[in-house]
Design a protein with these regions (language model features):
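Extended, subdomain-level signal for the structured scaffold at the beginning of enzyme domains
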Residues: 1-101, 112-211
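Short, thiol/selenol-centered motifs that function as redox-active sites or metal-ligating centers
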Residues: 106-110
Length: 211
């Protein structure tokens, strides 16, 4: 979450933080372990304004997705418990898509926000679209069995054209950012895609604004 947040903020954008139910967003303390913590995480720990947004987030019912140029769905374990399961989130993703704005993006488990969204015929909105998320192989490496939804499995099930990078030696670090054919969805494979995915979203927004 911290990487895309500061990418957008440092580019001069107003950045709001919301959650499905609103209120305080739980953060896994393991995110700040010395071998995982990023420069942006350290910046967050010294940023009371950002911390306040996490403690007092509005619910998605309190915001209009079409008021935003970009919407980014964060990764981590949390989204596996409520993104794909939320009928309301699926409805708002579909409505935002058909309104023509915003550009929507995600990294890692964040892509689960898209799998339950439907098109006007009732079919999965992601069907046939290039998309990515953390791979099953990367989850298996860490023996992740406790999360209820896995991005690769759910995206494939919804008919997405799942893309991913692989590395013969260090596959856990392999990553890629992909854009769908309409340039409406930008998805990153895992947390290592945070910078690139946020930057690509802003690049597409700039191109749209220039037309």
């Amino acid at each position: 979450m911290t990487v895309p947040y500061y990418e957008f903020l440092d580019a001069g954008m107003q950045v709001d933080v919301a959650s499905i139910k609103g209120g305080e967003i739980p953060i896994d303390p393991q995110s700040f372990y010395y071998f995982l913590i990023t420069h942006e995480d350290k910046r967050f720990l010294k940023d009371p304004a950002f911390q306040d947004k996490i403690k007092n987030s509005p619910s998605i019912d309190d915001i209009d997705f079409t008021d935003y140029d970009l919407i980014f769905f964060v990764g981590g374990w949390g989204p596996s418990y409520d993104f794909a399961q939320s009928k309301r989130l699926a409805e708002k993703v579909s409505a935002a898509y058909y309104a023509g704005t915003p550009i929507m993006g995600s990294v890692c488990h964040g892509a689960l926000a898209f799998v339950s969204a439907k098109d006007t015929s009732g079919k999965p909105l992601v069907a046939g679209r290039k998309m990515t998320g953390v791979t099953q192989g990367q989850l298996d490496f860490f023996r992740i069995k406790f999360t209820p939804k896995h991005p690769e499995e759910e995206l494939r099930k919804a008919g997405a054209d799942f893309r991913a990078n692989h590395h013969p030696v260090a596959d856990i670090f392999a990553t890629v950012t992909v854009v769908d054919h309409e340039q409406r969805f930008v998805t990153g494979q895992n947390q290592n895609s945070g910078h690139e995915t946020a930057q690509k979203m802003m690049e597409l927004l700039s191109q749209r604004s220039a037309k």
